[in-house]
Amino acid sequence: MSSVAIIAASGVGKRMNLRNGLSKQFLEIGGYPVIYHTLAAFQRASSIDKIYIATKPDSIATLETLAEEHQFSKINAIIAGGKERQDSISNCIELIALHIEKAEIDRPDTILVHDGARPFITPDEIDQIAQLSHHYGACVPATKPKDTIKYISDQPGFFGETLDRSLLLQVQTPQGFASEKLVEAHRKAREAESYATDDAALVEKFFPDQKIKVFEMGYHNIKITTPEDIFLGEAIYAQLQQQS
């Protein structure tokens, strides 16, 4: 089985209140940039053959230097992302297709799409998701919500119905898919000018018969989004270091 990873690392970190265009992926946890931890996990995952990264144009050189310094040999391309996250993933998919056509890489069985700002995914979890994606055609990691979730009422400032928490999961990444399904879903989305919140939603829309396997995760695989996440991330990093 062969797998390719796409890392979405174009986020500008608006909720981080960062200045001077700094990307949240370059904030440090444990003395290393967030994106370093992410890439290190995929570099060590035995299921991953190649890594493609979509980032801001002014971050490409920084990531190229990072890859060289830490010998992230699986990184095959670092390219400019698009206007939306989905556009960034599509850019990578088109490049992967071109590399396959030119026989520069073998056609992967699965493609995994991951948020660059989720630094605590482990190589073993990546490998398990890749295997399940290959077996079922699609696999998405998720956690059970800790908090009660409610609809917002039609009347501003008031709650509506309370959702049954036992029927809900909070979706994460990496999301894995049979490569032909993900490529075709993005092609159809481009043609229809259709956008979705994540790749699983695209596959659900264009391949409604494709069931998506749940990979239940722990609560360590957080996305660095707000300033508080840095402090939480330091604690998670310390715990993972003790376990390794």
Curated annotation (Swiss-Prot):
Catalyzed reactions per annotation: 2-C-methyl-D-erythritol 4-phosphate + CTP + H(+) = 4-CDP-2-C-methyl-D-erythritol + diphosphate
GO MF annotations in UniProt: 2-C-methyl-D-erythritol 4-phosphate cytidylyltransferase activity
Domain of life: Bacteria
Pathway: Isoprenoid biosynthesis; isopentenyl diphosphate biosynthesis via DXP pathway; isopentenyl diphosphate from 1-deoxy-D-xylulose 5-phosphate: step 2/6
BP GO terms, sorted: isopentenyl diphosphate biosynthetic process, methylerythritol 4-phosphate pathway
Gene3D superfamilies, alphabetized: Spore Coat Polysaccharide Biosynthesis Protein SpsA, Chain A (3.90.550.10)
Free-text function comment from the UniProt entry: Catalyzes the formation of 4-diphosphocytidyl-2-C-methyl-D-erythritol from CTP and 2-C-methyl-D-erythritol 4-phosphate (MEP).
Site, Transition state stabilizer: residue positions: R15, K24
Entry protein name: 2-C-methyl-D-erythritol 4-phosphate cytidylyltransferase
Family of the protein in this entry: Belongs to the IspD/TarI cytidylyltransferase family. IspD subfamily.
EC number: 2.7.7.60
Record-annotated site: Positions MEP for the nucleophilic attack: R165, K223
Keywords of the record: Isoprene biosynthesis, Nucleotidyltransferase, Transferase
Any one Pfam family match given in the protein's UniProt record, by short name: IspD
Keyword Hydrolase: no
First-level EC class: transferase
NCBIfam families, per database record: ispD
PANTHER family: 2-C-METHYL-D-ERYTHRITOL 4-PHOSPHATE CYTIDYLYLTRANSFERASE, CHLOROPLASTIC
Annotated SUPFAM superfamilies: Nucleotide-diphospho-sugar transferases
